[in-house]
Swiss-Prot record:
Pfam families linked to this entry: RbsD_FucU
Catalyzed chemical reaction(s): beta-D-ribopyranose = beta-D-ribofuranose
GO molecular function: D-ribose pyranase activity; intramolecular lyase activity; monosaccharide binding
Record InterPro entries: D-ribose_pyranase (IPR023064), RbsD-like_sf (IPR023750), RbsD_FucU (IPR007721)
Protein name per Swiss-Prot or TrEMBL: D-ribose pyranase
Keyword presence, S-adenosyl-L-methionine: no
Species whose genome carries this gene: Aeromonas salmonicida (strain A449)
Domain of life according to the entry: Bacteria
Amino acid sequence: MKRGVLLNAPLSALVAQMGHTDEITVCDAGLPIPAGPERIDLALMAGTPNLQTVLKALLTDLVVEKVIMASEIKLISPDTHQALLDQIETHSLEQGKPIAIEYCLHEEFKTRSRQSKAIVRSGEITPYANLILCAGVAF
């Protein structure tokens, strides 16, 4: 049995395969998932697992240099936006490297998600609760 924190086999393999600047989209239950990227569907029911839980699991093993979010989250879901910013800031401190935050319109976000290595679907049902993690380097 794997000893680390991240026990989900597809997520663990995904993180192990990430190279510098590779991207993972972590999304809510409603984001359309295009053909192309690997689809890792973790949604069990509305709200389970939530986006923050999925993000927490991924961040146990992933070095992140940039996060991209839809700008609409700031106005439509400000509490979730702030919680994600807090979680990203905590990870930045833990990894000892800054994490840039970028925003784009939701339609641009959906287009950008096509270049992700994988799209990880959570059970999150908060509007615009999606992000793209851009991998950094561990050295």
